[in-house]
Amino acid sequence: MLRIGIGGPVGSGKTALTEALVPLLIEAGRTPGVITNDIYTQEDAHHVRRELAGILDPERVMGVETGSCPHTAVRDDPTMNLAVGAEMLERFPDIDTLIYESGGDNLTLTFSPALADVFVFVLDTAEGEKMPRKRGPGITDSDILVINKIDIAQYVRTDLNVMESDAHRVRENRPVVLTNSLTGFGVDELHQQIMSQWNGARTELIG
Protein backbone atom coordinates (compact mmCIF):
# COMPACT_ATOMS: atom_id res chain seq x y z
CA MET A 1 0.00 0.00 0.00
CA LEU A 2 1.43 3.35 -1.11
CA ARG A 3 0.29 6.29 1.01
CA ILE A 4 1.03 9.78 -0.30
CA GLY A 5 0.66 12.86 1.89
CA ILE A 6 0.27 16.19 0.11
CA GLY A 7 0.50 19.35 2.21
CA GLY A 8 1.28 23.03 1.84
CA PRO A 9 -0.08 26.55 2.35
CA VAL A 10 -3.62 27.58 1.45
CA GLY A 11 -3.97 28.06 -2.31
CA SER A 12 -0.65 26.51 -3.29
CA GLY A 13 -2.39 24.04 -5.61
CA LYS A 14 -2.59 20.86 -3.55
CA THR A 15 -6.01 19.88 -4.88
CA ALA A 16 -5.11 20.60 -8.51
CA LEU A 17 -1.90 18.61 -8.08
CA THR A 18 -3.86 15.69 -6.64
CA GLU A 19 -6.25 15.84 -9.59
CA ALA A 20 -3.32 15.83 -12.03
CA LEU A 21 -1.55 12.98 -10.25
CA VAL A 22 -4.45 10.52 -10.09
CA PRO A 23 -4.66 9.84 -13.87
CA LEU A 24 -0.92 9.14 -13.97
CA LEU A 25 -1.23 6.66 -11.13
CA ILE A 26 -4.09 4.92 -12.94
CA GLU A 27 -2.14 4.89 -16.21
CA ALA A 28 0.76 3.26 -14.34
CA GLY A 29 -1.56 0.45 -13.24
CA ARG A 30 -2.26 1.62 -9.71
CA THR A 31 -5.69 1.87 -8.08
CA PRO A 32 -5.92 5.11 -6.10
CA GLY A 33 -8.30 6.58 -3.57
CA VAL A 34 -8.28 10.19 -2.38
CA ILE A 35 -8.91 11.57 1.11
CA THR A 36 -9.10 15.35 1.44
CA ASN A 37 -8.99 17.45 4.61
CA ASP A 38 -10.87 20.69 5.27
CA ILE A 39 -11.57 22.32 8.62
CA TYR A 40 -15.32 22.89 8.29
CA THR A 41 -16.44 21.53 4.90
CA GLN A 42 -15.78 18.87 2.27
CA GLU A 43 -15.27 21.40 -0.49
CA ASP A 44 -12.01 19.88 -1.74
CA ALA A 45 -13.58 16.41 -1.89
CA HIS A 46 -16.47 17.78 -3.96
CA HIS A 47 -13.97 19.50 -6.28
CA VAL A 48 -11.92 16.34 -6.79
CA ARG A 49 -15.05 14.33 -7.59
CA ARG A 50 -16.13 16.88 -10.21
CA GLU A 51 -12.73 17.23 -11.84
CA LEU A 52 -12.07 13.48 -11.96
CA ALA A 53 -15.56 12.47 -13.10
CA GLY A 54 -15.19 9.61 -15.56
CA ILE A 55 -11.63 8.95 -14.35
CA LEU A 56 -12.07 8.03 -10.69
CA ASP A 57 -15.19 6.58 -9.07
CA PRO A 58 -16.55 9.46 -6.94
CA GLU A 59 -17.07 7.05 -4.05
CA ARG A 60 -13.29 6.60 -3.97
CA VAL A 61 -12.96 10.23 -2.88
CA MET A 62 -13.75 10.92 0.77
CA GLY A 63 -13.51 14.08 2.84
CA VAL A 64 -12.46 14.65 6.43
CA GLU A 65 -13.82 17.66 8.34
CA THR A 66 -11.02 18.12 10.84
CA GLY A 67 -12.55 20.89 12.97
CA SER A 68 -9.01 21.84 13.98
CA CYS A 69 -5.66 22.99 12.63
CA PRO A 70 -4.75 20.97 9.53
CA HIS A 71 -1.44 19.73 10.92
CA THR A 72 -3.21 18.25 13.93
CA ALA A 73 -5.20 15.87 11.73
CA VAL A 74 -2.24 14.65 9.65
CA ARG A 75 0.62 14.79 12.16
CA ASP A 76 -0.24 15.16 15.85
CA ASP A 77 -3.35 12.96 15.89
CA PRO A 78 -4.11 11.37 12.51
CA THR A 79 -6.85 9.15 13.99
CA MET A 80 -9.63 10.64 11.85
CA ASN A 81 -7.67 10.20 8.64
CA LEU A 82 -6.61 6.68 9.56
CA ALA A 83 -10.24 5.78 10.26
CA VAL A 84 -11.42 7.15 6.92
CA GLY A 85 -8.57 5.37 5.16
CA ALA A 86 -9.56 2.09 6.82
CA GLU A 87 -13.18 2.65 5.80
CA MET A 88 -12.19 3.26 2.19
CA LEU A 89 -10.05 0.13 2.08
CA GLU A 90 -12.85 -1.91 3.59
CA ARG A 91 -15.24 -0.68 0.91
CA PHE A 92 -12.72 -0.93 -1.93
CA PRO A 93 -10.12 -3.60 -1.09
CA ASP A 94 -8.56 -3.26 -4.55
CA ILE A 95 -7.18 0.19 -3.70
CA ASP A 96 -3.38 0.10 -3.51
CA THR A 97 -2.67 3.84 -3.29
CA LEU A 98 -4.12 6.41 -0.90
CA ILE A 99 -3.57 10.13 -1.37
CA TYR A 100 -4.12 12.19 1.76
CA GLU A 101 -4.45 15.90 0.99
CA SER A 102 -4.02 18.11 4.02
CA GLY A 103 -5.91 21.31 4.56
CA GLY A 104 -3.90 24.45 3.85
CA ASP A 105 -1.37 25.20 6.59
CA ASN A 106 1.96 26.88 7.29
CA LEU A 107 5.57 25.81 6.79
CA THR A 108 5.59 23.65 9.93
CA LEU A 109 3.19 21.09 8.46
CA THR A 110 4.45 17.52 8.23
CA PHE A 111 2.75 14.13 8.01
CA SER A 112 2.85 11.39 10.61
CA PRO A 113 4.71 8.30 9.34
CA ALA A 114 1.62 6.37 10.45
CA LEU A 115 -0.32 8.16 7.71
CA ALA A 116 2.04 8.76 4.78
CA ASP A 117 4.95 6.88 3.24
CA VAL A 118 5.89 9.76 0.94
CA PHE A 119 5.37 13.37 2.03
CA VAL A 120 5.01 16.01 -0.70
CA PHE A 121 5.04 19.69 0.31
CA VAL A 122 3.68 22.21 -2.19
CA LEU A 123 4.74 25.85 -2.51
CA ASP A 124 3.69 28.16 -5.32
CA THR A 125 5.46 31.02 -7.02
CA ALA A 126 2.84 33.58 -5.94
CA GLU A 127 4.15 33.22 -2.40
CA GLY A 128 7.42 34.77 -3.53
CA GLU A 129 10.91 33.51 -4.25
CA LYS A 130 11.88 34.02 -0.59
CA MET A 131 9.71 31.13 0.62
CA PRO A 132 12.34 28.35 0.45
CA ARG A 133 14.71 30.53 2.49
CA LYS A 134 12.14 30.64 5.29
CA ARG A 135 12.72 26.92 5.71
CA GLY A 136 10.33 25.19 8.11
CA PRO A 137 9.90 21.40 8.35
CA GLY A 138 7.53 21.28 5.39
CA ILE A 139 10.22 22.71 3.14
CA THR A 140 13.31 21.05 4.61
CA ASP A 141 11.99 17.67 5.74
CA SER A 142 9.45 16.68 3.07
CA ASP A 143 10.44 13.82 0.80
CA ILE A 144 9.65 15.96 -2.25
CA LEU A 145 9.23 19.73 -2.48
CA VAL A 146 7.01 20.99 -5.29
CA ILE A 147 7.18 24.55 -6.61
CA ASN A 148 3.84 24.95 -8.34
CA LYS A 149 2.30 27.59 -10.64
CA ILE A 150 5.54 28.21 -12.48
CA ASP A 151 3.53 29.77 -15.31
CA ILE A 152 2.71 32.86 -13.23
CA ALA A 153 6.18 33.47 -11.80
CA GLN A 154 6.90 36.36 -14.15
CA TYR A 155 3.63 38.07 -13.26
CA VAL A 156 4.26 37.99 -9.52
CA ARG A 157 7.90 39.09 -9.85
CA THR A 158 9.29 35.78 -8.68
CA ASP A 159 12.66 34.73 -10.05
CA LEU A 160 12.07 31.03 -10.59
CA ASN A 161 15.77 30.28 -10.90
CA VAL A 162 16.46 31.83 -7.50
CA MET A 163 13.50 30.04 -5.91
CA GLU A 164 14.58 26.67 -7.29
CA SER A 165 18.24 27.20 -6.39
CA ASP A 166 17.40 28.22 -2.82
CA ALA A 167 15.08 25.23 -2.49
CA HIS A 168 17.85 22.83 -3.49
CA ARG A 169 20.27 24.55 -1.11
CA VAL A 170 18.09 24.47 2.01
CA ARG A 171 17.04 20.89 1.23
CA GLU A 172 20.63 19.81 0.64
CA ASN A 173 19.75 18.70 -2.89
CA ARG A 174 16.80 16.49 -1.93
CA PRO A 175 14.15 16.35 -4.69
CA VAL A 176 12.59 19.60 -5.89
CA VAL A 177 10.03 19.45 -8.71
CA LEU A 178 8.68 22.41 -10.69
CA THR A 179 5.08 22.06 -11.81
CA ASN A 180 2.14 23.67 -13.51
CA SER A 181 -0.60 21.38 -12.29
CA LEU A 182 -3.21 22.85 -14.65
CA THR A 183 -1.24 21.94 -17.78
CA GLY A 184 0.38 18.87 -16.28
CA PHE A 185 3.93 20.18 -16.67
CA GLY A 186 6.21 18.46 -14.17
CA VAL A 187 3.52 16.15 -12.79
CA ASP A 188 5.03 13.12 -14.52
CA GLU A 189 8.36 13.90 -12.86
CA LEU A 190 6.57 14.19 -9.52
CA HIS A 191 4.96 10.80 -10.08
CA GLN A 192 8.35 9.28 -10.88
CA GLN A 193 9.90 10.84 -7.78
CA ILE A 194 7.10 9.53 -5.57
CA MET A 195 7.57 6.00 -6.89
CA SER A 196 11.35 6.28 -6.56
CA GLN A 197 11.09 7.44 -2.93
CA TRP A 198 8.61 4.69 -2.08
CA ASN A 199 10.52 1.92 -3.81
CA GLY A 200 13.74 3.09 -2.16
CA ALA A 201 12.16 3.00 1.29
CA ARG A 202 10.74 -0.48 0.65
CA THR A 203 14.14 -1.75 -0.48
CA GLU A 204 15.74 -0.44 2.72
CA LEU A 205 13.10 -2.19 4.84
CA ILE A 206 13.57 -5.48 3.00
CA GLY A 207 17.36 -5.14 3.17
What do the PLM-derived regions correspond to, one by one?
Residues 5, 9, 35-39, 124-125, ...:
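G-domain G4 guanine-recognition motif of GTPases
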Residues 26-32, 145, 172-175:
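Short, surface-exposed connector motifs at secondary-structure boundaries
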Residues 43-44, 131-135, 159-166:
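Short, glycine/polar-rich helix-capping loops at beta-to-alpha or helix-loop-helix junctions
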Residues 63-65, 121, 178:
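Structural signal for conserved beta-strand scaffold positions within catalytic alpha/beta enzyme cores
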Residues 107, 134, 186:
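Short acidic active-site motifs
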Residues 110-126, 135-147:
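Inter-motif core of Ras-like GTPase G domains
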Residues 152-207:
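Canonical P-loop GTPase G-domain recognition
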